[in-house]
């Protein structure tokens, strides 16, 4: 991006700074970041595809996404630094390795070093804007958890959109797709 044109003395001839406009509701942006944070963690819902970066010693608050097409990708960010790693061939042939195994380790090593630099060391947790609620969700039924639920996780929702039903343990369990399409436990 061209920011400005200057004289040899540094005087500005013309500025080309963009006129920033908010195009995404901050609550929706936060929900996306929250989902991408889960990519880097292991919990009762399973292991995120990028959870290995934590095992490699990167501990700062961050979010990310792995990717595998013909190439291997990992895109991740902290509150003040974005880094995208691509591992691939220049002839569009498959690299035959996932982003979590090829690109994420490179990302983790770079970010561990980058957050040691003064300009990137002040990483902060991602904070939820007003209008985002956190609720405890049962990992089997994807409903609100209660004392009968053996495993649960906290999830972010737009205010007023969280599930209202409580998990039905120890009754019949249906996964999210079964609930969406109205199928019972046996696919009926």
Q: Which residue ranges define each predicted feature?
A:
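A penicillin-recognizing enzyme superfamily signal
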Residues: 1-160, 169
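Short, low-complexity, Pro/Ser/Thr/Gly-rich segments in the mature regions of secreted, periplasmic
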Residues: 173-188
């Amino acid at each position: 991006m061209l920011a400005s044109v200057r004289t040899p003395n540094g005087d500005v001839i013309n500025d080309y700074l963009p006129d920033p406009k908010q195009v995404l509701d901050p609550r929706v942006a936060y929900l996306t970041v929250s989902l991408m944070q889960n990519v880097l963690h292991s919990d009762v819902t399973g292991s995120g595809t990028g959870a290995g970066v934590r095992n490699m010693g990167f501990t700062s608050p961050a979010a990310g996404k792995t990717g595998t097409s013909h190439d291997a990708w990992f895109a991740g960010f902290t509150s003040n630094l974005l880094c995208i790693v691509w591992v691939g061939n220049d002839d569009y042939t498959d690299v035959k390795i996932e982003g979590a195994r090829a690109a994420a380790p490179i990302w983790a090593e770079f970010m561990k070093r980058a957050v040691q630099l003064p300009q990137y060391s002040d990483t902060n947790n991602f904070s939820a804007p007003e209008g985002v609620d956190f609720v405890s969700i049962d990992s089997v039924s994807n409903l609100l958890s209660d004392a009968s639920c053996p495993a649960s996780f906290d999830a972010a929702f737009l205010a007023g959109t969280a599930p209202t039903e409580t998990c039905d343990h120890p009754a019949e369990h249906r996964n999210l797709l079964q609930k969406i399409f109205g199928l019972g436990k046996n696919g009926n």
